[in-house]
Amino acid sequence: MASDQLRFLGSLEGHKGWVTAIATSQENPDMILTASRDKTIIVWQLTRDEDSYGYPKRILTGHNHFVSDVVISSDGQFALSSSWDHTLRLWDLNTGATTRRFVGHTSDVLSVSFSADNRQIVSGSRDKTIKLWNTLGECKYDIKDECHTEWVSCVRFSPNVSNPVIVSCGWDRVVKVWELSKFKLKTNHYGHTGYINTVSVSPDGSLAASGGKDGITMLWDLNEGKHLYSLEAGDIVNALVFSPNRYWLCAATASCVKIFDLESKSIVDELKPAYTDVQDEGRQPECVSIAWSADGQTLFAGFTDNQLRVWTVTS
């Protein structure tokens, strides 16, 4: 264990279903967004008080099934969400109104991502397609050739403007890298032995990490198109996210939240909250979503007990 431990700060209560995704904003560090199986997105105002870390400032309603993913535009003005109702929605965060509905997927949309310049949107679905959209809600490209043969569980744009790629993963156990300029497949990454739930791209766009059923987190070199190394997560990996400012990777697994130091390939910390009311059959709540604050000092984690929990790095 490294000296950077994490300290629990508190939890945010408001959702009535699993907290499925979390989005933080560099432009507005006092705001975070969470998506949930209660069909809503909550805009939280962070107060960081002793007794309460934040409160629901606004609730975005409109989806009529689970909300699976949410992202914020880089100016902090808009949010984009995906849902099992087969649609995406673009929201004006100042008014809470839906400004666009994106219709085209024929099954649950599981993942959504904004390009670095916020001009393009990518979505992945249980209909086994990846769609590229503009902000007007027009589908500009439908990736079907060489696409996943099973559900597309996660899609992410590289944050690196000079290397515009999309990384996707699916239940076909493949991580795919797509060249945005030509909408063409660049690399297939094989190695996982079970379905893949999540993929994350490092802040500089050089690495991708993937994880899922086999409990192994695999790291891929996006420039060279090769497997770098694997980290043992020890349980099903639900979500992965790179730290914005440290060489860390955070993994939400079925049993705990693990933070890996990628330099030493060691575990920085392992987070297991103290759950007050353990659910049916004594199953502990699982962490299914994670996000770092833009400055990398705060970790937000969403759980199947409908709670959002917050930790701070105490370096």
UniProtKB/Swiss-Prot annotation:
- Record field: transmembrane: none
SMART domains in the cross-refs? WD40
Q: What happens when the gene is disrupted?
A: Lowers the growth rate and completely impairs fruiting body formation. Lowers transcriptional levels of genes encoding adenylate cyclase and protein kinase A catalytic subunit. Also weakens transcriptional responses to sexual development induction by some genes related to fruiting body development, including 4 jacalin-related lectin encoding genes, 4 hydrophobin encoding genes, and 3 functionally-unknown genes.
**Any keyword DNA repair?**
no
UniProt keyword annotations, A-Z: Conidiation, Repeat, Ribonucleoprotein, Ribosomal protein, Sporulation, WD repeat
Per UniProt, what is one GO molecular function of this protein?
translation regulator activity
What PROSITE patterns does UniProt report for this protein, alphabetically? WD_REPEATS_1, WD_REPEATS_2, WD_REPEATS_REGION
What InterPro entries does the annotation carry?
Answer: G-protein_beta_WD-40_rep, RACK1-like, WD40/YVTN_repeat-like_dom_sf, WD40_repeat_CS, WD40_repeat_dom_sf, WD40_rpt
Show me the WD repeat boundaries: 14-54, 62-101, 104-144, 147-188, 191-230, 232-270, 282-315
Keyword GTP-binding (UniProt) = no
Q: Which PANTHER family did the record assign?
A: RECEPTOR FOR ACTIVATED PROTEIN KINASE C RACK1
Protein family per UniProt: Belongs to the WD repeat G protein beta family. Ribosomal protein RACK1 subfamily.
Annotated function: Component of the ribosome, a large ribonucleoprotein complex responsible for the synthesis of proteins in the cell. The small ribosomal subunit (SSU) binds messenger RNAs (mRNAs) and translates the encoded message by selecting cognate aminoacyl-transfer RNA (tRNA) molecules. The large subunit (LSU) contains the ribosomal catalytic site termed the peptidyl transferase center (PTC), which catalyzes the formation of peptide bonds, thereby polymerizing the amino acids delivered by tRNAs into a polypeptide chain.
| Protein name as catalogued | Cross-pathway control WD-repeat protein 2
Q: What is the gene name? A: cpc2
